[in-house]
């Protein structure tokens, strides 16, 4: 095997299975394994080119006759806040954010379970155990971090880690930006639009 062949990823296609987004449709995915022997630039380009990461697998939709799923990249310098986006930011001014190492905790998993049970109880992640969650957070060969969102308590003497956890975003650092891998949040406060807020906060 030549060095060029070794560095070039092998791609695979999954068998058709029910689409989790569009009823009555089938989905397929194109995927490749991310391994330490692959050049970092190659992995970076895959993620910038529309592939998503799940642990050490990069994948993208590969469905026949359907292109409804679109990977979105935001050009930060060209982005302009709409009125609705400003309202979302205003509604969450009482939150703090920290960028922390990708280390799973029981507190995170409890919020993750509440989110999955409320939003995706019939989805592919519904049966994830605490070990599965830990692997999702820790199993990465790229530069990964967590964005941790907590409610500001107003008590400067209280450790920040004691404040209520409102959301978590698992992110990868790329050469020209950030890729949000997965996020979850407190679903009991819909007026906050926390999913939208976390995207805006990263922008």
Please place each PLM-identified region on the residue numbering.
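Terminal substrate-recognition subdomain of acyl/acetyltransferases
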Residues: 1-103
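Histidine (H) residue identity feature
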Residues: 33-36, 120, 202
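Conserved acetyl-CoA-binding loop-helix of GNAT-fold acetyltransferases
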Residues: 191-203
């Amino acid at each position: 095997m030549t060095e060029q062949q070794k560095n070039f990823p092998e791609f695979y296609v999954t068998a058709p299975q029910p689409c989790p987004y569009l009823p009555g449709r089938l989905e397929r995915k194109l995927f490749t394994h991310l391994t330490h022997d692959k050049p970092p630039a190659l992995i970076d380009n895959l993620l910038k080119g529309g592939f998503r990461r799940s642990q050490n697998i990069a994948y993208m939709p590969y469905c026949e006759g359907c292109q409804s799923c679109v990977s979105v990249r935001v050009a930060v310098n060209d982005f302009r806040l709409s009125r609705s986006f400003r309202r979302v930011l205003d509604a969450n001014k009482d939150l703090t954010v920290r960028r922390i190492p990708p280390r799973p905790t029981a507190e995170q998993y409890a919020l993750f379970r509440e989110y999955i049970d409320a939003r995706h109880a019939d989805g592919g992640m519904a049966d994830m155990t605490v070990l599965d969650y830990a692997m999702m957070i820790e199993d990465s060969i790229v530069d990964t971090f967590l964005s941790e969102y907590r409610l500001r308590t107003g008590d400067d003497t209280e450790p920040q880690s004691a404040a209520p956890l409102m959301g978590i975003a698992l992110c990868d650092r790329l050469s020209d930006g950030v890729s949000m891998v997965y996020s979850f949040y407190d679903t009991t406060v819909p007026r906050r639009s926390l999913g939208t807020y976390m995207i805006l906060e990263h922008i």
